[in-house]
Amino acid sequence: MPYIFYDTETSGLETAFDQILQFAAIKTDDDLNEVDNFNVRVRLLPHVVPSPQALLVNRVAPKLLTDQTLPTHYEAICEIRNKLLEWSPAIVIGYNSIGFDEELLRQAFFQTLHPAYLTNTEGNKRSDVLPMVYATCAYEPNTLSVPINEKGNPSFRLDQIAPANGYNFINAHEAMADVRATIYMA
């Protein structure tokens, strides 16, 4: 069964109120070789006020949010849905995706009147690399290098753990770059 690795960049952290600003995905074969990829940026909905912190983290200029050449939210979500259906059935997987990206994706499908549970229906299954990293560190503690953050705690953030394990991470918090780092960590 192929894999669909994906990531979103969003207008904030509130899954019920914020929106996807960028969605990227890579379909791989069983050996994690890239078969196809998809990347779309999304125009900001008129009623969504983006978090300044999210814009700083994602390095999105406010001007880009209203760029009329970008697809509308509805158009982009339709493109995402069509691509996921085209690639199905597959294992849909991200990094820290079950509790965040997955919820935003479901909310976006719901808001655009599409079935919300695409990632675990239509023959699809879902997973998350972050719990796999936790399990690897717990059961094989010398397998991965885990960086220590400024508070002296282990950091499992993708933008920190991937480089600590040899990944040349350029452009963290850009959805396609994060997808490639997730595949590396898988």
Which role does the model predict for each range below?
Residues 58-77:
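Metal-dependent phosphoesterase signature
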Residues 73-87:
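Short, basic/hydrophobic alpha-helical segments
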Residues 6-9, 25:
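N-terminal phosphate-binding or glycine-rich loops at protein starts, especially the Walker A/P-loop
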Residues 9-16:
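Short acidic, Gly/Ser-rich segments with clustered Asp/Glu that frequently serve as metal-coordination loops
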Residues 18-23, 27-60, 83-186:
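Metal-dependent phosphoesterase core characteristic of DEDDh/y 3'-5' exonuclease domains
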